[in-house]
Amino acid sequence: MIGDAMNQQASIRALAGKLGMSRQNFYKGRTARRKAEVEAELVEQLVRGERALQPRLGGRKLFKILVPVLENEGIRLGRDRFFDVLREKGLLVPPLPKSPGTTRFEPSLPVFHNLVAGLELTGPDQAWAADITYIRTDEGFLYLSLLTDMWSRKIVGFHVGESLETQGALFALAMALASLRGEARPVHHSDRGCQYASHQYVGKLKEAGLQISMTEELHCYENAMAERVNGILKQEYYLGSCFRKKKQAKAAVKEAVYLYNTRRPHKSLGYETPEKMHRAAA
């Protein structure tokens, strides 16, 4: 044992000599390398743990979530090093292709002017963005109706239906209306889809005292926030996958909306979550 230790010391002295450094500095370097390895292992474990909840959460948002945890362990890691670890461990998220839309325009139905273009929002419940997207299952398509607060980014209403009929959008609207506080009456913004232009839906908006706003062109750019939320749910929470059962898809939607609202930080919100921003402004 003593001989082995002496041989190891001799080997270290020889290696340090070849590298042009003292044995003490060699040990420091080895300790630093081991420290970096341990830090990388911890980052990997934390990222995989968060990705178990939010499978496609991007690197910047992961960094914002995990920095306090790392600092609590005495680890100060810059963003560049954090991304290096993600790259080394194969944890960067590749982009997914965009999905086709679900907008159906009916020329005989009423249309409204775009009231949110250039609108300066100062708090929640001032404007909502509405949209419908589809969910694939082996049992057929489902259709997800969403209403998102345009200031806090919180999903305030949602419903998964079996068809593109207006009823699904009405259920999401009812949920959103139930969340309103006090006398707040947001502008309701959507595309020109027949669900939102239907007499039944427009009547419900007017009955609730909401102003009606629509895109003035048949493209997604004037309803970019709603499209963005659709993309996040499909790409980061795998709602763009094909589910075996409709029941599974509905459960996945419910979980995705909860995680999006309560755990996903947004750059536009100073890396706070929609739920926190919405509640803090109450």
Residue ranges and their predicted role:
Residues 1-10, 44-52:
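Short, amphipathic alpha-helical "recognition" segments used to contact nucleic acids or chromatin
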Residues 2-24, 89:
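Structured, non-catalytic alpha/beta "coupling" segments that mediate domain-domain communication
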Residues 15-16, 26, 47, 62, ...:
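Mobile genetic element proteins and their domesticated derivatives, centered on retroelements
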Residues 23-123, 273-282:
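Basic, flexible linker segments flanking DNA-binding modules
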Residues 103-105, 190-192, 198-201, 214-234, ...:
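RNase H-like two-metal-ion nuclease catalytic core shared by retroviral integrases
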Residues 117-156, 162-164:
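An active-site-proximal beta-strand-loop segment
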Residues 140, 158-182, 197:
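Active-site beta-loop-alpha junctions of metal-dependent nucleic acid enzymes
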Residues 206-210, 232-282:
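C-terminal domain-tail junction helix/linker
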